[in-house]
A protein has these predicted regions:
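Dinucleotide-binding Rossmann-like beta1-alpha1 core, especially the glycine-rich loop
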Residues: 30
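Noncatalytic modules at the cell exterior or secretory-pathway interfaces
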Residues: 25-27
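Metal-dependent phosphoester/phosphodiester hydrolase catalytic core
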Residues: 1, 6-9, 13, 17-23, ...
Length: 343
């Protein structure tokens, strides 16, 4: 049923009776996504559901710990825990506990969550000769404990070889969701549609299943984990942090069952920091130029002359969320604007 919020008048509704349980399996979602030529927009408030066919699955609830990634370099374990957005009034402490087979859990590290709602955990003198279970724990302001469980693999240094999975240029959709229905560009082509399996890649189920079938010992993500214009156009003011986190969460959510138990190295690239090209130029800010925007002069940064378009606060937040768990750099000295390094 859809009711007018002001008058309570019934606007639309449908009732089906005698529906078999297997015919209504799945989730329930509401979306406001009109075609580009449409002008109406909607929002939803106080959404409720009920009935014998509605089941709450706590094992499918997302958050507050969204995902983890880790790397193991000789005897140093580094792990990042990506949390969902939290109030500044919520507790800060995130804990890492581990256990070997048949043993009890014991705490080995703790860290406050910081920029990007990410906690960075570190354990020196790690025993890399064995496999360890781990859980990341977070206690919220209501005293409820939440956990995210995974496996730290042993160092494969004595194995004759191992498989590396390589990813880059990951897009949640083939075409942006604001671009209409995706009519075929040539007569013999099949249209993609909008909310179809041909257009929607997220949550990358087939891709991840194929990767897992190879049992990789290392996952390397070489850049463009996100695209600023996908699945929706970039909302990029002076600091596009909120828009970035939305798109980064899609990646972290989709790949979390892979990264929770596979050592992972992540390198950021141009689209991760909302640029179409990136020549770092020692960390300098990209020079500005004046362009015409709808009849008015506007000063913008020219990425193709080298440097960064956005400020160091945003750049470092992206690197923290994506690469904060990478092995220590050879030389941690930051480049200009105090931008961190990963090499």
């Amino acid at each position: 049923l859809a009711l007018d919020g002001a008058t309570g008048e019934l606007r639309a509704g449908a009732v089906r009776r005698g529906v078999r349980e297997q015919d209504v399996s799945g989730g329930v979602a509401l979306a406001s996504s009109p075609l580009p030529e449409g002008r109406a927009r909607f929002w939803f408030r106080d959404v409720q559901s009920g009935g014998d066919k509605i089941v709450v699955r706590q094992d499918r609830v997302i958050g507050p710990i969204l995902s983890t990634m880790y790397s193991l370099n000789r005897n140093v374990l580094k792990m990042s825990a990506q949390l969902m957005p939290l109030s500044e009034r919520e507790p800060r402490t995130v804990r890492l506990e581990v256990r070997s087979v048949g043993a009890e859990w014991r705490e080995v590290a703790q860290s406050p969550w910081g920029g990007g709602y990410t906690a960075l955990l570190r354990v020196d003198n790690w025993d890399s000769s064995r496999v360890w279970d781990y859980r990341v724990r977070y206690r919220d302001s209501a005293g409820i404990d939440h956990e995210h469980i995974g496996v730290v693999q042993s160092d494969p240094k004595d194995e004759p070889g191992f498989t590396i999975a390589h990813l880059s240029c990951v897009m949640p959709t083939a075409r942006g969701l604001e671009g209409g229905t995706g009519e075929a560009e040539i007569p013999v082509a099949e249209p993609l549609g909008r909310y179809t399996s041909k257009n929607l890649h997220f949550p990358h189920t087939e891709l991840i299943g194929n990767i897992l079938s190879h049992k990789p010992r290392l996952l390397v993500c070489a850049g463009d984990q996100i695209y600023e214009g996908n699945p929706t156009s970039a909302d990029a003011p002076d600091n596009p942090t909120l828009d970035y986190l939305y798109k980064w969460y899609l990646w972290a959510w989709a790949f979390r069952d892979l990264t929770r138990s596979t050592p992972t190295i992540v390198q950021t690239d141009d689209h991760d920091i909302y640029q179409g090209n990136l020549w770092g130029n020692g960390g300098r800010a990209a020079p500005t130029e004046i362009i015409d925007v709808s009849g008015r002069a506007e000063r913008v940064r020219d990425q193709n002359r080298g440097g960064y378009v956005y400020g160091p606060e945003f750049i470092n937040l992206v690197q923290r969320t994506q690469s904060g768990h990478n092995p220590d750099p050879y030389d941690p000295t930051p480049i200009e604007q105090d931008i961190g390094v990963n090499y």
